[in-house]
């Protein structure tokens, strides 16, 4: 990844960074909740973004 990024790339990376976090604990506490963890987590070394 170059140090000079276009705004579109930067915005794309920012979105992916926001998506890559665990679910909040209070969501797990909700009644009838079946979500245990965020299945779409991405590790920076294992899975690349295909950029």
From Swiss-Prot:
Cross-referenced SUPFAM superfamilies: Ribosomal protein L39e
GO MF assignments: RNA binding; structural constituent of ribosome
Keywords from the named record: Cytoplasm, Ribonucleoprotein, Ribosomal protein
PROSITE patterns in the record: RIBOSOMAL_L39E
Pfam families membership: Ribosomal_L39 (PF00832)
GO CC list: cytosol; cytosolic large ribosomal subunit; cytosolic ribosome; extracellular space
UniProt-listed GO biological process terms: antibacterial humoral response; antimicrobial humoral immune response mediated by antimicrobial peptide; cytoplasmic translation; defense response to Gram-positive bacterium; innate immune response in mucosa; translation
Keyword NADP appears in the UniProt entry: no
Cellular localization per UniProt: Cytoplasm
Task performed by this protein: RNA-binding component of the large ribosomal subunit. The ribosome is a large ribonucleoprotein complex responsible for the synthesis of proteins in the cell.
Subunit details: Component of the large ribosomal subunit. Interacts with IMPACT.
Family: Belongs to the eukaryotic ribosomal protein eL39 family.
Listed name of the protein: Large ribosomal subunit protein eL39
Species name: Homo sapiens
């Amino acid at each position: 990844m170059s140090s000079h990024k276009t705004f579109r790339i930067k915005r794309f990376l920012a979105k992916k960074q926001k998506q890559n976090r665990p679910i909040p604990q209070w969501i797990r506490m909700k009644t009838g909740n079946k979500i245990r963890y965020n299945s779409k987590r991405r590790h920076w070394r294992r899975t690349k973004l295909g950029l």
